[in-house]
A protein has these predicted regions:
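C-terminal alpha-helical interaction appendages
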Residues: 1-50
Length: 50
C-alpha cells in the first residue's frame, strides 16, 4: 500500500477521515508546490495532533 493509503486508513480507523481530507485541502492551498505525499503527511499530523 502507498503511504497516502495508509494515512487515510489510519485516519478512518480513528474517525478522522473527513477531517483529514479537509486539512489536505488547506495544506494544498498553503503549499501548492508541495508533493502530494508530503501534503497528506502534514495534514495527518495536524489532524491527529502528532
Amino acid at each position: 500500500m502507498s503511504t497516502i493509503e495508509n494515512l487515510v486508513y489510519s485516519a478512518y480507523e480513528h474517525g478522522q477521515r473527513d477531517n483529514l481530507f479537509k486539512e489536505v485541502q488547506k495544506v494544498k492551498v498553503e503549499h501548492p508546490n508541495m508533493p502530494l505525499e508530503d501534503i497528506y503527511q502534514k495534514a495527518y499530523s495536524n489532524v491527529m495532533k502528532t
